Each structure stands twice: as C-alpha cells, then as structure tokens.
C-alpha cells in the first residue's frame, strides 16, 4: 500500500508541477502579465471555500478517495478547456481565461486536503502512525512535481515536430512547453490519470447516513471550533500571515529569472533560459528536507519548526533579490535550496499539527481549515498585494534575447526592491510568531 500511496502523490503533484512555476510567463506572453497576481490569488480564493466543503463531504457522506477521484476528473476536463482556449487565442482575454482557470482550481485545490485525508485514513486503518509514514509518502509528490517541471522546461512541439532542448540557440527553444499552452495540456492528461488511479484506492469505511446537514455543516463552519484551542488559534492566525509567502515565488520567480535573457551580460546564461529547470531546485530541496520535519518536531518543537520556516522564506526572498545568473548564480541557487525548509517546515508540519488537533469526526475539516487559512485567506490577500508591489517596479515589454531569435515578452524593471520588501515581511512574521506562540505539551505521533 505504501507504493500505491506514493504513486498517488507522484501524480497528484505532477498535475501542478506542469504549470505552476511557469504559468506567469505564459500569462505575460498572452498579454495578461499585469494580472499575474489575480491568477495566483485565485488559488487562495477557491481555498476559502472548497477544501473545507469537500472535507465536510469526506467526513460525512462519501469516501474521501471517491471525492478525490471525482475532483481530479472534473479538473482535468476544465484544464483541457483552458488549453483549447489558450491555444487558439495568442492574446488572452482576462475574463474568459480567468474563469476557466478558476473552474479548474475549484476542483483541483480540494484534492490537496482530500489526498491527505485519504492517506491518513489508510495509514491508520493499517495500524500505522501518520507522523512517521506521511513524510515518506509525501516526498513522492515532490518527485512528481520535479519530473513535470523538467519535462515542460525541455519539451517542445512545433510544426509537427516534438523534441527536447535546453539550448536557447535551438530554433525550437521558444516553443518549449514552459512558454506555451502545452503545459496546460500535459497537466490535463496527468489529471485524468490521477483521477482514474484514485478511484482504485481502497475505501477505508463506507459513508454513514447522517441527519440533515445544517448550513454550518455544509460550509464547514464547525471547523472553526478549533479556534477555541489557544495554541491552534495562534497557529491559524499566523498561517494566514505565512500564506502570504506561499505563492509569491511561484508567480514571479520564473518571469524574474527569464528577464535576465534580455540583459546582454546574462543573455548566454544557461540559467536565464532554463528558469523552470533552475526553479526545480526548490522542489529537489523539498524532497531532501521533507524527512527532516518529523525529527525537527520531536526535537525542537512545533513553535521553532514554524519559526525556522519563516526565516527560510525571508532568506529565499533576500537571495532572489541579490542574485543573478552570472556571478550571483550561487545566491539564486541558495534561494532555491532554502525552499525545502521554508515549505516543508510550514506545510507538512502544519498538516500533521492539524491532524493531531482535530477529533476523529473532523479530520477532513481540520485539513481543509488549514488550507482555507494559508492557501485561502493568506495566499489571496498576499498575492494581490505582492502583485501591486512588483507591478510598481516592473513592467512587461517585447525585448530581443539571443541573436537571431524573435523578441520575447519579458518582465523588465527593478526586481531587487520587491524581493527585499518580501524578505523583510517574512522576517517580521518569524519574530512575531516566536514571541506569540505557546503550546500545550503534545506528543506528535
């Protein structure tokens, strides 16, 4: 069963890895560069409602793996529609494309919590401890994300020809999936495979008949009872503040690295032309660091695990602001490597923490509530503000890149200032969390 759950996470995150980091570049090329923040904020917008809602259904009405499969199948259909639209419209209409993407997210984002709920249930049904087994399974999600990133970074399709390249001097390099709507098609295909696969997983227990649900049940409002626990309340408030950091680099790091292609001193840099590949170092770091979460929670406690995560976010933004593909390449690499600590020490530790804090009838609610606070409220508000900050320093323009190649639409301007602003923000939140969080002694298992 460990192998089957590992495959689930591999596919689950490969769907996301196909487009998440390079989606901003696609939007910019399609004339929606000034609206990047709204597309990444949409991740948070749907997380305000759908994870807790589907978590409620998983707790009360249907097996979580059934909902997981159904959501993936619905999401893949909508993503296919987004690919069809983007392929036939070189200049994207904001309303049409945003609604398609919002529809995809409405079905895909609940699968994050549903996959965790399904996995935790299967582990417990076999006498296992989620604290010990979950990180070893979740690491395959990171591997799937990396594999998808590498594929879209190097694969191209042009004039009936399919192949792979990393060289900007290759005439087909500008048709790589990281620059084109093909990233959406690959995501859709993987979503179809994930949905079908999820439906083959075992059902831990059949759904029980429940009394008619109240409005608070339907919208997951009872999950907010967890706010009565002081330590959980503090964590969830800071989950909102930490959620601000989650989507910033996803939305802007690849366009930022790509912009160096238009600067003469970096135009021949392999890193500048392979931003998605460079960005994948973040996920490689995540894969190596994920197994540290359980050890860290036992040895230094939840409070310091989250504090370290926030300090890592600050270091990531700082290194992005000071780095470049030339003599500052080491700083870009460091910014990618610290992501493993920044993401895992918040995300994985947070999900384990909420699993412990929720009672047996509300495990799905607990997972959904964390998604709502971090990926929902935090990521939505944070990304909108971050987009305004970046747009005040940078703008999209058609610029020449490598000699003989067609001009590209790139995000040009003063990138150092916004990255330093984000670094200062994360540092401030880290200090506040260390000062404010106090927990009742808890054994994590």
Features from the language model and the residues they span:
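Juxtamembrane intracellular "pre-TM" segments in multi-pass secondary transporters
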Residues: 201-237, 263
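Hydrophobic core of transmembrane alpha-helices in multi-pass small-molecule transporters
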Residues: 10, 75-79, 90-114, 118, ...
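Multi-pass alpha-helical transporter architecture, strongest
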Residues: 53, 81-87, 190-202, 394, ...
């Amino acid at each position: 069963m460990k192998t089957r759950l590992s495959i689930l996470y591999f596919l689950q995150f490969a769907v996301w890895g196909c487009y998440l980091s390079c989606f901003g570049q696609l939007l910019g090329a399609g004339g929606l560069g000034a609206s990047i923040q709204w597309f990444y904020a949409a991740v948070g917008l749907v997380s305000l409602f759908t994870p807790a809602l589907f978590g409620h259904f998983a707790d009360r009405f249907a097996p979580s793996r059934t909902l997981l499969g159904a959501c993936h199948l619905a999401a893949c259909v909508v993503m296919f529609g987004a690919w069809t639209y983007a392929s036939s419209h070189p200049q994207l209409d904001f309303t049409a494309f945003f609604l398609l993407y919002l529809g995809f997210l409405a079905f895909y984002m609940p699968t994050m919590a549903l996959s965790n709920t399904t996995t935790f249930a299967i582990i417990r049904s076999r006498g296992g401890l989620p604290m010990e087994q979950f990180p070893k399974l979740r690491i395959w999600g990171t591997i799937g994300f990396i594999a998808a990133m590498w594929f879209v970074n190097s694969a191209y399709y042009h004039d009936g020809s399919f192949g792979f390249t990393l060289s900007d001097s290759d005439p087909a390099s500008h048709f790589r999936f990281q620059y084109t709507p093909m990233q959406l098609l690959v995501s859709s295909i993987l979503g179809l495979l994930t949905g079908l696969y999820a439906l083959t997983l075992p059902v831990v227990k059949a759904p029980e008949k429940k009394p008619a649900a109240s409005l608070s049940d339907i919208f997951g409002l009872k999950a907010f009872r967890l706010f009565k626990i002081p330590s959980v309340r503090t964590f969830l408030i800071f989950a909102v503040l930490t959620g601000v950091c989650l989507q910033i680099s996803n939305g802007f790091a690849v366009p930022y690295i790509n912009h160096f292609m238009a600067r003469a001193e970096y135009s021949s840099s392999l890193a500048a032309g392979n931003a998605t590949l460079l960005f994948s170092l973040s996920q490689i770091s995540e894969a190596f660091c994920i197994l540290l979460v359980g050890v860290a929670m036992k040895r230094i406690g939840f409070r310091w695990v989250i504090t370290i995560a926030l300090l890592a976010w600050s270091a990531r933004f700082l290194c992005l602001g000071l780095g470049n593909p030339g003599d500052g390449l080491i700083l870009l690499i460091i910014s990618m490597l610290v992501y493993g600590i920044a993401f895992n020490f918040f995300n994985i530790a947070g999900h384990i923490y909420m699993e412990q804090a929720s009672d047996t009838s509300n495990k799905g609610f607990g997972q959904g509530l964390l998604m709502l606070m971090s990926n929902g409220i935090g990521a939505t508000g944070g990304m909108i503000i971050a987009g305004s900050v970046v747009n005040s320093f940078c703008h999209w323009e058609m610029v020449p890149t490598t000699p003989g190649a067609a001009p590209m639409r790139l995000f040009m301007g003063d990138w150092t200032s916004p990255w330093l602003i984000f670094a200062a923000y994360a540092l401030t939140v880290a200090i506040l969390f260390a000062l404010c969080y106090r927990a009742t002694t808890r054994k994590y298992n």
